[in-house]
Amino acid sequence: MKFILIAIGGAFGALFRYFVSKVFNTHFPFNYIPLGTVIVNVLGAFLLSFVLFSSIERFEVNPNFVLFFGTGFLGAFTTFSTFAYETLSLFLTSPFRALVYFFANLFFGFFAAFFGMVLGRGKFL
């Protein structure tokens, strides 16, 4: 049963990642860095942090929901492999753009996770 929840969540997460990346890369073209990947990674960092900290400190969350949404959906929605590939790809043409992209993912991802933690816990640190 757990594998099915993760697989279904993963299928939805992968489809949603494709949709979000396509929308941001098509309708909000920002040719300096691949914005779609930054958006999905930052949004995923926020959501996972929010859900996990909420479930630990404020609400009783069904463990099956955490498997479906956290492991399945958000695991497939966020993408470290695409981030790594795009960073190296950018590095070949513009090392500076690669650094901007790399640090944008890290900075905004950690900021989003921190913000998700604060909102999930309902208190600052």
From Swiss-Prot:
GO terms for molecular function: fluoride channel activity; metal ion binding. InterPro entries: FluC (IPR003691). It is a multi-pass membrane protein. The keyword Chloroplast does not apply. Na(+) binds at G75, T78. Keywords: Cell inner membrane, Cell membrane, Ion channel, Ion transport, Membrane, Metal-binding, Sodium, Transmembrane, Transmembrane helix, Transport. Pfam families: CRCB. The chain crosses the membrane at residues 3-23, 33-53, 65-85, 99-119. It is found in: Cell inner membrane. It comes from the Bacteria. Na(+) is not transported, but it plays an essential structural role and its presence is essential for fluoride channel function. It catalyses: fluoride(in) = fluoride(out). One of its GO terms (biological process) is cellular detoxification of fluoride. One of its GO terms (cellular component) is plasma membrane. Fluoride-specific ion channel. Important for reducing fluoride concentration in the cell, thus reducing its toxicity. HAMAP family: FluC. Belongs to the fluoride channel Fluc/FEX (TC 1.A.43) family. PANTHER family: FLUORIDE EXPORT PROTEIN 1-RELATED, FLUORIDE-SPECIFIC ION CHANNEL FLUC. This is Fluoride-specific ion channel FluC. It comes from Thermosipho melanesiensis (strain DSM 12029 / CIP 104789 / BI429).
